[in-house]
Amino acid sequence: MRIIPISQQECSELLQRVSIGRLACSSNDQPYVVPVAFSYEPDCIYIFSTLGKKIEWMRKNPKVCLQADEIGNRSNWTSVVVTGTYLELNVPQYHTAQREHARELLAQCSEWWRIPLSGARDRALVSSMETVFFRIDIKSISGLRAIPEAEEPVHQ
């Protein structure tokens, strides 16, 4: 197996194909990683969540990272890492249009709301949960691909 970097175009294509990734944030030098449903646009990533540890931590430290991948097997995979800044879209006077845009994009993924609400079993609890739409303003994107030995180009 060989691991090679992929182009920005290939990174963008993967982020458009997949809708689940892992969001990393940190507080007081302690990292925290959770799965999230997301929707990608060239300059940002939209995510929906309920209020909890990750939102509290990102409010304190807005530097975040998102990792998404496609895995065939241990020697055939592609991974993309996005770094950026957390921006909450729940301030009505500033972000109503962006929040609605995020909702429309995320609604294209039929499971977009399930991850944040998966812990809630009771309908009353779900309706009382504070929800948060946010975006990651992208600072950098990079990616790697693992190529199985049999697929490596032969040089003469």
Where are these regions (language model features)?
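Extreme N-terminal tail/first-helix region
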Residues: 1-17, 89, 154-156
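Short beta-strand segments
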Residues: 18-50, 66-67
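Short, solvent-exposed loop/turn elements at beta->coil junctions and helix N-caps
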Residues: 26, 69-72, 120-124
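A short local loop/turn or secondary-structure capping micro-motif enriched for an aromatic residue
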Residues: 41-42, 54-57, 74-75, 97, ...
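Surface loops and adjacent helix of pleckstrin homology
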Residues: 50, 69, 146-148
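Short, solvent-exposed aromatic-acidic interface loops
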Residues: 50-53, 106
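Helix-adjacent hinge/juxtasegments
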Residues: 53-89
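Charged, gly/pro-rich active-site loop segments
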Residues: 77-156
